[in-house]
Amino acid sequence: MRLHAFTLLSLLGLVPSFAAASLSGSVGPLTSASAKAAKKTCNVLDYGAKADKKTDLGPPLAAAFAACKSGGLVYIPAGDYAMSTWVKLANGKAWALQIDGVIYRTGTDGGNMIMIEHTSDFELYSSTSSGAMQGLGYEFHASNNWSGPRLLRLWDVSDFSVHDLILVDSPSFHFSIDTCSNGEVYNMAIRGGNHGGLDGVDVWSTNIWIHDLEVTNKDECVTVKSPAKNILVENIYCNLSGGCAMGSLGADTDISDITYKNIYTWNSNQMMMIKSNGGSGTVSNVVFENFIGHGNAYSLDIDSFWSSMSAVSGDGVTLNNITIKNWKGTEANGAQRGPIKIICPDKVPCYNILIEDFAMWTETGSKQWYSCQSAYGSGFCLKSGSHHTSYAVTTTTVSSAPSGYSAAKMASDLSTDSGSTKSIPIPTIPTSFYPGATPYSALMSKQSTKAAKARAVDMSVETPAAASRSEQVVQGAPQETGQSAPESAGPVPSGNPGPVPTGGSRPSRHRHGHHHFGSAI
């Protein structure tokens, strides 16, 4: 049974009807991890894995998956594991992967360390919220090699979730969601090197909900690529990152019904960018709402002549029905890079662009500019009218701060980047991702701790062995930076979705995908 699906923003009445679409249906796994584990549990230690940071985890993980791929839970207990051969876990159904240990890359092949493909009803998570993949990318980057392996990729996966996982220092991209559907990604921390090409999350899929993530790197924070439809991205903390984006966009672009909401961007390349250079196709029905930025180079940057990508054949990508609403904060230097830059193709001008409640101000100097080219709509430098002809760049310079630009900051804003030539410690997953917004789901470690404490109260019905298991689960809280996850007694099924953020409503999850039970099996 599925919960009734609805479109979040249309219910709230916050945006025009043309841009109200977000999710098109329910997301998440069809059955709970506890039900999968009850059917069968495949512990990688039983297939030859050793938590000694030397023995290759690849073959035992593949063997455990083969035993549980038709229904079950693959379990990687707490501890430190080396991984020198990559795994492609394909054609699974109704299975889960619980990573409570830390996986260290020791191999040097390209490709993807863990790739999940052609799979349905799937969940990937850490019950302690401290399971991690440590890519040790600095070993590549120190010699100027940026083409090493990616950490995690999902391809052709439906009805899934990925949560409570930490991805660190990938030699290349961290997490790609490729041609998937009905998925939820949440409660994650991604910490990469300070260089381009080390993307946080890239998604080109259908009906995906991405929320409550922190990303540190110097390229994509959470970026939508083509083709993509019905994607909701919210409560995102781009903490010294590249910033969120769409693109790069090329030929036959097909992106529609995308919402970014509650996006906090600190000391990054941009708050939001749509990037292309030539090409064809469309981007339509898009909402960028509730953005806070501080210290970023660019704020809103729509660039249809982006020089960092090679020109693609075509008149350009058509952008239409785009709403930019409730942006506040500051940019690094508004005289150098103004807070609004909308540069559209001359042969296919942008239209129906709406900018409202936009108040940004410069941190350096006393003036800033807004710039538009071949762009139509309402607000700032946009031209009005229904006859959309090309026009040259128009720039408006202002020397007084707009009212209401002041915005909150996050207490965890980083003061220094991670560099790219030294080891990056494993962070903890934060419990806040946007000022004033409560995450939709509590961390697994918090849920497990509460459940274990509740179980420990009733000692009259609990055996000494069970009490020991409860105590171990209580210890499964996030660890200090750089430490390994604690040992646990066994797999802990994922569980109850947490509180709804203030003023928001929860998009539909599959009924059985997130009923977390908390205690050990």
UniProtKB/Swiss-Prot annotation:
GO terms for biological process: cell wall organization; pectin catabolic process. Pectinolytic enzymes consist of four classes of enzymes: pectine lyase, polygalacturonase, pectin methylesterase and rhamnogalacturonase. Hydrolyzes alpha-D-galacturonopyranosyl-(1,2)-alpha-L-rhamnopyranosyl linkages in the backbone of the hairy regions of pectins. This is Probable rhamnogalacturonase B. Disulfide bonds join C42-C68, C221-C238, C344-C350, C372-C381. Residues 1-21 form the signal peptide. Its EC number is 3.2.1.171. Pfam families: Glyco_hydro_28, Pect-lyase_RHGA_epim. The gene is rhgB. Belongs to the glycosyl hydrolase 28 family. It comes from Aspergillus fumigatus (strain ATCC MYA-4609 / CBS 101355 / FGSC A1100 / Af293) (Neosartorya fumigata).
